[in-house]
Structure formats: C-alpha cells, structure tokens
Amino acid sequence: VLAKTLFFAYRLVGLRLGSYLGGRLGLLAGKISPDGQRAADNLAKAMPHLSEAEQEQVKLACFEQVGRVFGEMAHLPKIAREADSRLSIEGAEHVEAALPDGGPAIFIGGHFANWEVVMLGIQRLVGDTGALYREPKNVFMRKWLLNQRDAFMPIKIPAGPEGSRELLKTLKGGTSVALLIDQSLPQGDPITFMG
C-alpha cells in the first residue's frame, strides 16, 4: 500500500518533481536502511582504494539514482509517448552494422540509470523486442508495474525455466530479446564472491 501511495504521489507531482522526490527518498534509504549498510560493506571490498568519504559518496549516488528510477516509474507511459523528444541513442550505427538484415539479436545490459527506458531505445532500433523480467515479490505492485511497462515492453517474458523456453522461441521466431543480467537468483550453486 505504501508503494502504491508513493507512485500515486509521484504521478501527481509530475515527472521532474517525481524523479527528484524519488531521489531524495533514495538518499534517505541509503543512509538508514540495512541495504545501505550492505552497500557500504560491498563498496569497501570492491573499491578499497577509495576513502570512506568517497565510498559513501558512491553509495549515496547509487541510492539516489535508484530512487529517481522509482520516481520515474509512475511516468513510464508518458516517457514512452515522448520518447522522440526525451531519448537520444548513441552508437546506433554499431547495432545497424551488426544486424544489416534487422536481427534477431540478444541485447544485454544492467540496472544502470533508468533501466526501464532502455527498452524504448532498443525498440527504436530493431522494433518489438522480447524483454526478460522478474516479477516483483509484492503482488499488489506486480500488475501495476506490468501495466506501466505495456507502453514500451509489448513482449514480456517472465524469468525462470518457462521464460527461458519462451526466450528461445522468441529468438527463433526472428524477434530480438533484451536481458538485464546483473540480478541475483536463488537457483544455482553458491560461490564465494570477493572473499
């Protein structure tokens, strides 16, 4: 209920202010949440060459950016409608050179900046694209988020064994797919990472 209330408020105040307020809440979460402490611990391991102040700056910038993404999620349909004026694509010539016949291709990315908007750019380059996604754990948010994504993610492929088969079927059918591959998954063998 809290998340839906926040998204309603973000939508009410508009895209720019919603993004800003989301960023402010993200900063607060980075300072007081257990996730903020986990991020600080991971940064100390990953970037020991940075001072504690620099590590804190990196951590808070990450939390602010994630907060901004959440603030912008309430406006995904608007962003999709205004993509021509809001989105610029650099390096499109590389995609065109790699896919002279139009595809299909596998686009791989991570959760950087507003990762939701990446699909708009891919679709501008190659048309409708299948997107692998993980359903939110919060059942109340699941339907809302899928509806928000309808504007730019017409082919949604849920993560998991069935999704893997659907992903291959989509590629074999001549349609490109996109994956964000930096998520942790509960399946598989555990490994020690960074000590």
Predicted segments — roles?
Residues V1-G109, R142-L146, A151-M153:
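Membrane-anchoring hydrophobic helices of lipid-metabolizing enzymes
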Residues P77-G195:
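Soluble catalytic domains of membrane acyltransferases
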